[in-house]
């Protein structure tokens, strides 16, 4: 058995068995890996898809447990096991009392609509393709002030609301939103109840990025986009209090923190 791997932040870890991991071994973190000539790779006994070049990807949710096991089968048929220990994160909690009930829970009249929309978004995030864009750096999609962070949560009248799973970038309506990495549009809708103008890009092997509260979409479903392409404009659509981009990162249905991977440079400057 190999030595346990720990990581507080961005890491490149390798061993004598040619295991290489890059990313963040922490709650909300995405990790890419590489093992030469591996026949199979598993995380906690669940198979991971492997690219022809031996790369794979996985991630850890907001409240994921801290101990995990990565295992792989070498070309000779033998299995290797690598324990992983991820770091626990503290999140911003905001408790607000005296809020009117209608703002705590949505009216019953919109439940059918919101369930249908949630199903469509879930299906888009379940997209699996063999693109390998996820191996490329993730650049900043828009200019503006960081107004909200991943993992934060509000309590209204003692009732916990869903945690925030994105990075909010506040700026005026019409501010360009650029593709932070190449991908394919798998979802584009101008008017979802909660998220308003919503766009989802597929980057391969279960990795997607989502763009919410958009004023205008400049791409459509099925369209290929390149790093730095203008894909949308910041807006205040859906249930929001002001114009901003809510930017999200997913590995399948696992919600991750895009801020951990975001390069400081604006995506449009990389074209």
Residue ranges: model-predicted function:
Residues 197-202, 207, 223-270:
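Conserved, short, structured surface segments that act as functional micro-motifs
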Residues 26-28, 36, 65-67, 79, ...:
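Extracytoplasmic
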Residues 10-18:
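Hydrophobic h-region of N-terminal signal peptides that target proteins for export
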Residues 176-187, 219-234:
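Short, well-structured beta-strand-loop connectors
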Residues 83-195:
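Surface-exposed, glycine-biased beta-strand/turn segments
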Residues 180-218, 243, 248:
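Zn2+-dependent peptidoglycan hydrolase active-site motif and core
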Residues 19-29, 34-89:
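Ser/Thr-rich low-complexity repeats and stalk/linker segments
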Residues 1-11:
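Sec-dependent signal peptide recognition
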